[in-house]
A protein has these predicted regions:
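Periplasmic-binding protein-like
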Residues: 141-148, 213, 217, 221-259, ...
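Short helices/loops that flank or line small-molecule/ion binding pockets
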Residues: 91-92, 100-101, 105-119, 132-134, ...
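Ligand-binding clefts/hinges and TM-proximal coupling segments of bilobed small-molecule sensing domains
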Residues: 172-192, 227-231, 259-280
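Extracytoplasmic small-molecule ligand-binding "clamshell" domains
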Residues: 41-122
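Flexible hinge/capping segments at coil-to-helix
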Residues: 148-165
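Bacterial lipoprotein signal-peptidase II cleavage site
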Residues: 18-39
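Extended ligand-binding regions for polar small-molecule ligands
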Residues: 23, 83-92, 171, 217, ...
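A ligand-binding cleft/hinge motif common to bilobed small-molecule-binding domains
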Residues: 123-131, 176-179, 202-203, 207-236
Length: 280
């Protein structure tokens, strides 16, 4: 399969989030690295990863921008299902979240380097991530879908053999392309973020995109900026979870917070607000 990697230059984002009991902040991976260096003393004295995170008081949460998980709304507020859920969990743990935009393709590298403390961004619980990180239980359902322009003839992935197909680098969409007999014969182009994939299909520079159902439901179709795009196929079902450093005890603490938020109705209310299905 021919692979072309396109370069992406992203400007640094300065965003703010109103959180329960305090204001959550956003920054870039560069500032997260500085934060990690400044937390060296905490790391040396912490008895566990959870102690390390609580000692800092601000878990650094790695994310990429895409609706409905993490995005800036029409009022300029940083929000989303994962944004609100992470904030609610942090409140349970007695800490304040700091959201840092990352390169999704190097997410585990940044996690291990302590540039970030967790990956929380509609992250599919793949075998690879579960082998290389400590993951929480699944909290939401998702699927990888094929998105094309209206009017495109499509009956199966066989129609995309030799065509240009895009997905986010290092994503479950990329894995779905590599694992599909027909899509593996497409002219695959990786993109830095999923939203770029929609832009490519809309512009006609790509024939199809493979990306998250959650994003497609929120960003394409009538009433959106991509009204002429449509979902034509669902490739596989999957679930979202959160990843911490391998061996971390923080994942179990987040699981307990999930249970509490499910019991008090917060988790279901967020799912209803953002039109997501919770994991069983």
């Amino acid at each position: 399969m021919k692979r072309l990697v396109s370069a992406f230059l992203a400007g640094a984002m300065a965003l703010s989030l109103a959180a329960c009991g305090g204001a959550a902040s956003t920054s870039t991976a560069a500032s997260a690295s500085a934060s990690a260096s400044g937390s060296a003393a905490v790391s040396q004295t912490a008895g566990s990863d959870l102690d390390y995170i609580k000692g800092k008081g601000k878990p650094v949460i790695g994310y990429t921008v895409y609706e409905p998980m993490h995005y800036t709304d029409a009022d300029g507020s940083f929000t989303g299902f994962d944004t609100e859920l992470a904030t609610a969990v942090c409140e349970k743990l007695g800490v304040e979240p700091e959201f840092v935009e990352i390169n999704w393709d190097t997410k585990v590298v940044e996690l291990d380097a302590k540039s970030i403390d967790c990956i929380w961004n509609g992250m599919t619980l793949t075998d690879d991530i579960m082998q290389n990180a400590a993951t929480t239980k699944a909290y939401a359902k998702n699927a990888q879908v094929v998105v094309v322009k209206d009017g495109t003839d499509y009956t199966s992935t066989a129609d995309l053999v030799g065509k240009t197909v895009v997905a986010e680098a290092g994503s479950a969409g990329e894995a779905a392309i590599e694992g599909d007999e027909n899509l593996a014969q497409a002219d695959y182009v990786s993109k830095s973020v999923q939203t770029d994939c929609l832009m490519e299909v809309a512009a006609g520079t790509a024939d199809a995109a493979v990306l998250d159902l959650t994003l497609a439901n929120a960003m394409i179709g009538e009433g959106t900026d991509y009204a002429d795009l449509k979902i034509v196929d669902e490739l596989n079902a999957e679930e979202y979870g959160v990843a911490f450093r391998k061996g971390s005890d923080a994942a179990a603490a987040v699981d307990e917070a999930f249970d509490a938020l499910k019991a008090d109705g917060t988790l279901q209310a967020l799912a209803d607000k953002y039109d997501l299905a919770l994991a069983d």
